[in-house]
Regions:
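An N-cap/entry alpha-helix motif that binds or orients negatively charged groups
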Residues: 35-112, 210, 217-250, 386-388, ...
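N-terminal secretory signal peptides
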Residues: 1-12
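A gly/proline- and charged-residue-enriched helix-loop-helix capping module
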Residues: 144-165, 169-182
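Short beta-strand segments
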Residues: 122-123, 173-175, 199-203, 347
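Alpha/beta enzyme core
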Residues: 184-323, 334, 339-342, 348
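Glycine-rich active-site/cofactor-binding loop and its immediate structural neighborhood
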Residues: 115-154
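C-terminal helical cap(s) of enzyme catalytic domains, especially alpha/beta-barrels
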Residues: 304-310, 355-373
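N-terminal export leaders
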Residues: 12-26
Length: 398
């Protein structure tokens, strides 16, 4: 079995196959005419970035292949990854022809504190692979854009260093462990460093066998995340057919155990069903975080956007709902808000900005999304975030 694993890991991935096919075409006689720009290479400047999508080609050009693939890909066949983006096409914006949009405000109050925008930076791991200063650089860029950042439990730097890098608002994301003391130690360190909220991830009960084999090449070249605690031996090497014990651990009683130690809001991240949303509230969560992990956990899961309305109905206004997965534009943000989210988080887009241009790139991406949100609000006749409701959209989910 170990030999089969090694052979499988060495085989071409989907993206490698595409690259090989492109190389074959390039060598074809059909493409034998000399390219006058063959040796010309130019990376666009930051001031040329108009949409978030503009950052991805620059990111692709700058990063090693393994690092880019780790960030870009989804679980297994990537159905969920594709569905996340497709779901925004199932929601139309309803224009409002006559409306006074001369003054538009995007500030929102969340858990008693006011944010200038409903857009936050989602937790994402190992940003040191994208930029030498990793999460510290991300915090600088997010702070410059007046945007709250959620720091991943699997960050490349300690929470103390990340918090000291800038003065913006921070939350902390926790991957639960079986060792309760380890969970409590991590939460204490995060709150002592200045994190005012905690997001507990509940949607990584196992790791894709295919993805795990591909990602070992990346992980082997990076430092172990300093906030993650002790890492057990990877059980997938020895038991490829079972759930990896010792990695993540989820029981609802965990929320009961840690609630009293968290001074600010506590949210459960990775909720995709109304029943789980109700259980979040029953076990002391102050908010529900709707997410499918950006299509990186369960293949053939529903998109976050299509399940959002049902979860909103189940929650019935008792707690705020945070949303992520698939957001690339300001109109995407408005669609999620219209379907019931109080705020949204973006993951890949600020990572593109970080990899391409460092902190200024992060700031620019977030400012682009903010400008696009204001534009979409103007066209739909909404002058404040509170004015955005389901009448701003028309849905056609399959």
């Amino acid at each position: 079995m170990r030999i089969l694993e090694q052979a499988w890991a060495a085989s071409l991935s989907r993206r490698n196959a595409v690259r090989a096919f492109a190389a074959l075409l390039t060598g074809s006689p059909l493409h034998s005419q000399q390219d006058p720009f063959r040796d010309h290479s130019r990376v666009a400047g930051l001031d040329e970035m108009v949409t978030a999508f503009d950052f991805e080609p620059v990111t692709y050009a700058k990063l090693p292949r393994e690092v880019y693939d780790y960030m870009a890909h989804g679980a297994d066949s990537e159905f969920t990854l594709r569905r996340n983006r497709e779901s925004y096409d199932w929601v139309d914006l309803v224009p409002k022809g006559v409306a006074n949009s001369s003054t538009i405000r995007t500030d929102v109050e969340l858990f008693g504190s006011k944010m200038p925008s409903p857009i936050m930076v989602a937790p994402s791991s190992l940003q040191g692979a994208l930029h030498p200063d990793g999460e510290m650089a991300m915090h600088l860029g997010a702070s410059a854009a007046n945007t709250r950042m959620i720091v991943s439990n699997a960050a490349s730097f300690t929470i103390e260093k990340i918090a000291a890098a800038a003065k913006g608002s921070l939350w902390f994301q926790l991957y639960p462990k079986k060792d309760l003391d380890a969970n409590l130690d991590g939460l204490e360190a995060a709150q002592k460093a200045g994190c005012t909220g905690v997001v507990v991830t509940v949607d990584v009960q196992a790791v894709s066998y295919e993805r795990d084999l591909h990602d070992r090449r990346l992980a082997s070249g990076l430092l172990r995340p300093p906030n993650a605690g002790a890492r057990p031996r990877d059980p997938l090497v020895h038991n490829p057919y079972g759930a990896p014990e010792g990695r993540m651990w989820y029981e609802w009683k965990l929320f009961d155990q840690i609630r009293s130690t968290i001074k600010g809001p506590m949210l459960a991240k990775g909720i995709l069903t109304p029943e789980d949303a109700r259980l979040c509230i029953e076990h002391g969560c102050d908010g529900v975080y709707v997410s499918n992990h950006g299509g990186r956990s369960l293949d053939y899961a529903p998109s976050s956007l299509e399940v959002l309305p049902g979860i909103v109905d189940a929650v019935a206004g008792r707690v705020p709902i945070i949303f992520d997965s698939g957001i690339r534009t300001g109109s995407d943000v408005l669609k999620a808000l219209a379907l019931g989210a109080k705020a949204v988080c973006v993951g890949r887009t600020p990572r593109w900005g970080l990899a391409a241009y460092g902190p200024p790139g992060v700031q620019r991406v977030l400012e682009i999304l903010q400008a696009e949100l204001i534009q979409a609000m103007a066209y739909t006749g909404r002058t404040s975030i509170d004015a955005i409701d389901k009448t701003a959209v028309r849905t056609d989910f399959p």
